[in-house]
Regions:
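A structural signal for short loop-to-beta-strand junctions that line the ligand-binding cleft
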Residues: 1-29, 59, 161-168, 243-251
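Extracytoplasmic/periplasmic solute-binding protein
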Residues: 4-17, 22, 43-94, 125-127
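A bilobed periplasmic-binding-protein/Venus flytrap-type ligand-binding module shared by bacterial periplasmic
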Residues: 25-28, 170-183
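Glycine-centered hinge/linker elements that transmit conformational signals in sensory
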Residues: 48-52, 83-113, 154-157
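Short amphipathic alpha-helical coupling segments at ligand-binding clamshell hinges
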Residues: 93-100, 173, 182-194, 202, ...
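Periplasmic-binding protein-like
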Residues: 98-99, 148-176
Length: 306
């Protein structure tokens, strides 16, 4: 799935190099003291938020397109139409997910933004969804709580068959070859060599030898990532989450998606606007830009939302 943001129109335009994705961090000592179990679903989360608030504590889940898309995919929605010509935010799955997502901030008052490491360290936020590479920060910045925290998969959405959809949205970087490259064969061999499991593993370990645990490398190569010096407990949970990582596709004009999602989100949170109507309003703006860019690039324009 780390290929998704580099795939368009049947072509693949990069080889994944790094992959970051969210995981659930929690303070084992504080949750045990409060008698709170690690939440498995978002329904569990809302129940837990009430218990945390009674103790002047918070649950962390930042307001962002990436986090909304996690809930969207868990509810069988998508960011763009199947033909990649329009936003899918006007579909019922997206509207339902947006209503659930904004409710966390409107009614349960979780913070839109926060500084994770400090709040997690001092116990104000004993449980939060954050990028798994925050592991690096906590190992160095919060060494005094070593052994007092752990990770688990991000809470999911219950399916009709009783299983839990644990999909999360990650972000990837990739290696590309410039179109005008003179030595294409040599460049291609280098890209294959650089992104291979052995070399990515060696690179990750050498960087960590030089800079310490805070420099743990977010390899997109799953084999290389597995062979980095994780503890058994940490990697066991990490590998469980990796199986459910997806990425948001890239489309012409797609930069308006994050911009207008943010506009819609903040309008609902800060101005108490109707989630459905607000999302539909900004979806029109997203689609207008996608249409303009498709016209600019000479692509066939059509599909839903135009």
């Amino acid at each position: 799935n780390s290929l998704i943001p580099f795939t368009y129109g049947g072509g693949v335009y990069a080889i994944p190099e790094t992959l970051s994705f969210p995981i659930l961090f929690y303070r084992t000592d504080i949750l045990a003291e409060l008698g709170i179990e690690v939440p498995k679903t978002w329904d569990d989360v809302t129940e837990m938020i009430v218990d945390l608030s009674h103790n002047n504590m918070q649950f962390g889940f930042a307001g962002s397109l990436q986090n909304f898309a996690t809930m969207l995919y868990q509810n069988n929605g998508k960011v763009y139409s199947d033909d990649a010509t329009a936003s899918a935010f006007n579909e019922n799955e997206a509207i339902t997910a947006f209503e659930k997502y904004t409710k966390l901030y409107q009614y349960f008052k979780i913070p839109v933004t926060f500084e994770f490491a400090n709040r997690f360290r001092n116990g104000q936020m004993p449980i939060a969804v954050a990028d798994y590479m925050q592991y690096n920060t906590l190992r160095i910045f919060a060494s005094e709580i070593d052994g007092l925290w752990s990770i688990a998969p991000v809470p999911g959405t219950m399916r009709s068959d009783g299983t839990i959809n644990r999909t999360v949205v990650g972000t990837a970087t990739g290696c590309i070859m410039i179109k005008g490259t003179k030595n294409k064969e040599s460049a291609w061999k280098f890209m294959q060599w650089w992104t291979s499991a052995d070399i990515q593993e060696q690179y990750g370990k050498k960087v960590e030898e030089k800079l310490g645990a805070s420099a743990r490398y977010a390899a997109a190569n799953a084999v290389a990532l597995e062979h980095l010096p994780w503890s058994y407990e940490f990697y066991n949970e990490l590998s469980s989450q990796i199986k459910n990582v997806t990425c948001i596709p890239e489309v012409p004009g797609g930069y308006f998606t994050s911009r207008h999602f943010s506009n819609a989100f903040r309008k609902v949170i800060y101005q108490n606007e109707n989630p459905r109507e607000t999302l539909l309003e900004y979806t029109k703006e997203i689609n207008a830009e996608i249409t303009d860019k498709r016209n600019e690039f000479g692509l066939t324009t059509g599909g839903k939302g135009h």
